[in-house]
Every structure is written in C-alpha cells, then in structure tokens.
Amino acid sequence: LGLVGSEMCIRDSFDKDGNMNNWWTEEDAAAFKAKTDILVKQFDAIEVLPAKDGQPAIMANGSLSLGENIADQGGLRVSHTAFRNSLNGTEPAPIDGFTADQRFYLAYATLWAQNIRDEEIARLTKLDVHSLGKWRVNATLRNLQDFYDAFSMTDGEMFMPEEERVVIW
C-alpha cells in the first residue's frame, strides 16, 4: 500500500483533469516550499557512508530525492489511514507480540530492506532520485506521529522531537 500511495502524492504538476498544469497559488507554493525545505535539510543531514581511508563522509542529497521522499511520506500516511479504515474500528489480536499498527510499519520497513556494497551506496546517493531503502524507512517514519504511537516511543535513536518533524501531505 505504501508504494501505491506514494504514486498518489504527486503535487502541483497536474490539474483536476490530469493535464500538466501548475494550479497552485503563490501562497500555496510558499507554504509548500517552507515545509519541503525542512525535509531537504533532514535528508541532507543523513550520513549514508562514514569517512573512510581519507575520503570524506557521503551525505544523502535531500534536494535530489525530495520528490520521492514526499511521495514516500504521503503514500505511507494514506496507506496507514486506509489500513486503519479497513479494520472497521476493531483491533486484531497481536501476532508474535506485535500489534496491527506495528506489523504495518514492520511490513513497510521490510519492503525497503537492502544489502548493498559501499560503492553502490555512493553511486546511488549521487544519482538516484530515490533515497536508499534504509532512509526511505527511517527518515520517513521519524516524521510520523502514528509511528511513534504504534511503538509507544518517546525517546531513542529513531525519535525526533515533535517540533522538528514535518508532514507534507
């Protein structure tokens, strides 16, 4: 569902009839830019590879991956809402100690699991408009209150203070 929802979060490029036409007001565009600037900075701060053998650390490129990062976040939120709605107010019994919401987020994380060499990490970071799988998960989830609620998280490595979070859609 997160992948399908991701494709639904393309923003201002198309009008209600599906024609390529930017339909936003200047105020809409300014508000959107303010939020996306925060998301870019969050991703720019991610060290994807530490410094090694005299080479500097490689950082994620939040500007390059912005469109896909927005789509991942929006798609995950839409998918989680659809998932909750499908339960019709019931709460399934935990499975293997995990609640339904926890399993939802674990399934999302599993979707993007990767085992790739450092050289490929460096290459993809420079040219792929998608963030690496680890960050499609961790950096996206850190902004979503429903994720924190699912795991009763109030601190720790994954925790981001509420005032630093940004939700685009």
Where are the regions a protein language model picked out?
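Single conserved hydrophobic/aromatic residue that forms the stacking wall/gate
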Residues: 1-5, 9-10
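Zinc-dependent metallohydrolase catalytic domains
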Residues: 11-169
